[in-house]
């Protein structure tokens, strides 16, 4: 199975929708994805991700299935005490690096001003719910790997979501620290990341990264780019 992860286009965060630029980016992403053999499209329930998914759905004449657990994750203080930059994951990862911490060693997340961040429970939520979703697709989590238990795993699906929730998903699937993924991937608008999993029924498998953070479709072809 191929799982294509796509971040939403340039957003109006206040109204939770795409800006005109975001719609341009989403249309370009749809053209980029039209020949990938996508058989099913999933999306976060948030408007900016769903509107991005609709562009691809229209090109492929498909419907979009919403996955509630892939809404953007929350961050902030869990106890009202001080937390760096309100717990923003990308700012937090950069600050940890500036202090000399390794993002591959999560020991620094256990102490102030990092430990009281609600983002940790959010990441755990995405991990638990993603296991249920992946099992419905034919992949049952066993330890750090996945057992192929389905009969229809030789296909391609797409999931449109957010920088935070997709990083949480990748963190779990790839067995890598969440804050490391925030720094290592940090997806652009409509950036595409592709994972592949073996379809050999009964076997154990782990995801292979085929593409990471590919946003060439909005960096060329006349579509402006804006962070």
For the regions a language model picked out, list residue spans one by one.
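Alpha-helix N-cap/helix-start capping motif
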Residues: 46-50, 163-164, 189
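Active-site-proximal alpha-helix that buttresses catalytic centers in soluble enzyme cores
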Residues: 2-71
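Conserved histidine-centered catalytic loops in small-molecule metabolism enzymes
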Residues: 39-69, 92-101, 196-227
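Short glycine-rich phosphate-binding loop at a beta-alpha junction
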Residues: 39-45, 148, 156-159
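Acidic, low-complexity terminal tails and accessory targeting/binding regions
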Residues: 73-92, 140, 144-156, 167-227
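Flexible, glycine- and charge-enriched loops at secondary-structure boundaries
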Residues: 15, 19, 23, 116, ...
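Active-site metal-binding loops of divalent metal-dependent hydrolases
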Residues: 9, 163, 213-215
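Phosphate-handling substructures
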Residues: 61-139
């Amino acid at each position: 199975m191929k799982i294509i992860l796509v971040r939403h286009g340039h957003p109006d965060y206040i109204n939770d929708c795409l800006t005109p630029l975001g719609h341009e980016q989403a249309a370009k992403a749809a053209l980029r994805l039209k020949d990938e053999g996508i058989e099913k499209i999933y999306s976060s329930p948030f408007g900016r991700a769903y509107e991005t998914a609709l562009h691809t759905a229209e090109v492929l004449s498909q419907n979009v299935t919403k996955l509630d657990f892939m809404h953007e994750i929350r961050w902030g203080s869990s106890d009202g005490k001080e937390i760096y930059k309100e717990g923003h994951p990308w700012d937090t990862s950069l600050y940890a690096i500036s202090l000399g911490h390794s993002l591959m060693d999560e020991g620094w997340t256990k102490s102030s001003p990092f430990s009281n961040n609600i983002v940790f429970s959010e990441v755990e939520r995405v991990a638990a719910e993603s296991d249920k979703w992946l099992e419905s697709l034919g992949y049952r989590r066993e330890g750090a790997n996945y057992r192929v238990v389905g009969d229809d795993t030789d296909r391609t699906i797409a999931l449109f979501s957010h920088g935070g929730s997709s990083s949480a998903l990748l963190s779990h699937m790839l067995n890598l620290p969440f804050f490391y993924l925030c720094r290592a991937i940090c997806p652009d608008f409509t950036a595409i990341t592709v994972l592949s999993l073996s379809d050999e029924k009964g076997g154990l498998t782990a995801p292979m990264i085929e593409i990471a953070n590919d946003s060439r479709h909005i960096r060329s072809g006349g579509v402006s780019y804006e962070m």
